Amino acid sequence: MARVTVEDCVDKVPNRFELVMLAAHRAREISAGAELTVDRDNDKNPVVSLREIAEETQSADALRERLIESNQSQIEVDEPEEDSMALLMGGEADKPQEDDMSEEKLLRALMEAQGQG
């Protein structure tokens, strides 16, 4: 069989840079254990990936989507805590009301509690 060149694939993917990116991505998929859609014929993964593109057993659109998905990353957004969420929504924070008890009032209340107990 004749060697596969980029020329065999240019009619499927006109941009040579994109073709190389897609073929490299497919070669990495094959290295990771993806099923081949053409016979290996003792070729290395990059050549097999170019043959798959040339024979259209792997569509350029599907490869492009998989390449994009593999390069995307998920960013986890921290959710605000309940108190912060209530304030953001215009409500009041869920916290105990502050007592305006002075030290003198506290001591008096303790003395009364001990005297009654």
UniProtKB/Swiss-Prot annotation:
Keywords: DNA-directed RNA polymerase, Nucleotidyltransferase, Transcription, Transferase. The keyword Nucleotidyltransferase applies. GO terms for cellular component: DNA-directed RNA polymerase complex. Pfam families: RNA_pol_Rpb6. Its EC number is 2.7.7.6. The keyword Membrane does not apply. Signal peptide: none annotated. It catalyses: RNA(n) + a ribonucleoside 5'-triphosphate = RNA(n+1) + diphosphate. GO terms for biological process: DNA-templated transcription. GO terms for molecular function: DNA binding; DNA-directed RNA polymerase activity. Promotes RNA polymerase assembly. Latches the N- and C-terminal regions of the beta' subunit thereby facilitating its interaction with the beta and alpha subunits. NCBIfam families: rpoZ. The RNAP catalytic core consists of 2 alpha, 1 beta, 1 beta' and 1 omega subunit. When a sigma factor is associated with the core the holoenzyme is formed, which can initiate transcription. Belongs to the RNA polymerase subunit omega family. This is DNA-directed RNA polymerase subunit omega. It comes from Ruegeria sp. (strain TM1040).
